[in-house]
Amino acid sequence: MTAFFKKPKRYMPLRQREPKIDAPQGLMTKCPSCKYMHYTKQLNENHKVCDCGYHFPLHAQERIDMLVDEGSFERFAGPSVKANPLDFPDYEEKLTKDRKRTGIEEAVVCGKATIDGLPLVVCVMDARFRMGSMGAYVGEAIASAVRTATSLGLPVVLFTASGGARMQEGMVSLMQMANTSIALKEHDEAGLLYIAYLTHPTTGGVSASFAMLGDLNVAEPGALIGFAGRRIIEQTIREKLPENFQTAEFLLESGQLDAVIHREQMRSFLKKMIELHDGGVRHV
């Protein structure tokens, strides 16, 4: 009976917390698609592709190492352009910070290389640097690389990864859409092959210029590709867009891409395309 009149406790015992595991930073990488936790080393050995098919972004040098013959890449010197043409506040400090963090001069790396002995000019954008945005340096580097390819009679393979035009450079940035397009037009008139390889993300002014001007336009699986953002389009047209809108697969279904190529097939695909076009020279 005494237990019946006994006052109940107003608290509950707390479960003892499990000790926190002090894992080294960068040891594990979580897939944003399937949420699986990978050992970063194993993920890198798998060319940063998850078992679910998600393609993690590659750094410019990682993609070059995976693509071209070992020791064949000859990097072109960067163009001489004014770093801050509009004197935008803090812009130069941000560029310096990105250079230290990424180890590259700007958001694109261009050079001459070979794939199984087949010569080509390759340009790779790196979204770690200012989100791969296109300013005067990026535009002129790509245009100069394309002009070099034209003079040497070589095909061009360009990997895009960009948030679009660089806002800190205003009209100077937008001019690069025309600059790169003109260089590619001259390359095309010389009867040479240009393959645009779109990776995640390819948006804005880049998607509206050289990213979609290839003789072959291909993309990695799941890549976000588009000009304006999804929300802006939905607000403008006042309609709900499909779930897979602006993905590589959606563009392929719509006829805006020629193929969606898994990263493991990238090198063999490009080799085959260059061989099919007589080493990148198209007969006109």
UniProtKB/Swiss-Prot annotation:
Zn(2+) binds at residues 31, 34, 50, 52. It is found in: Cytoplasm. PROSITE patterns: COA_CT_NTER. It comes from the Bacteria. InterPro entries: AcCoA_carboxyl_beta (IPR034733), Acetyl_CoA_COase_Trfase_b_su (IPR000438), ClpP/crotonase-like_dom_sf (IPR029045), COA_CT_N (IPR011762). Signal peptide: none annotated. Keywords: ATP-binding, Cytoplasm, Fatty acid biosynthesis, Fatty acid metabolism, Lipid biosynthesis, Lipid metabolism, Metal-binding, Nucleotide-binding, Transferase, Zinc, Zinc-finger. GO terms for molecular function: acetyl-CoA carboxylase activity; ATP binding; carboxyl- or carbamoyltransferase activity; zinc ion binding. PANTHER family: ACETYL-COENZYME A CARBOXYLASE CARBOXYL TRANSFERASE SUBUNIT BETA, CHLOROPLASTIC. Component of the acetyl coenzyme A carboxylase (ACC) complex. Biotin carboxylase (BC) catalyzes the carboxylation of biotin on its carrier protein (BCCP) and then the CO(2) group is transferred by the transcarboxylase to acetyl-CoA to form malonyl-CoA. Belongs to the AccD/PCCB family. Acetyl-CoA carboxylase is a heterohexamer composed of biotin carboxyl carrier protein (AccB), biotin carboxylase (AccC) and two subunits each of ACCase subunit alpha (AccA) and ACCase subunit beta (AccD). This is Acetyl-coenzyme A carboxylase carboxyl transferase subunit beta. It comes from Exiguobacterium sp. (strain ATCC BAA-1283 / AT1b).
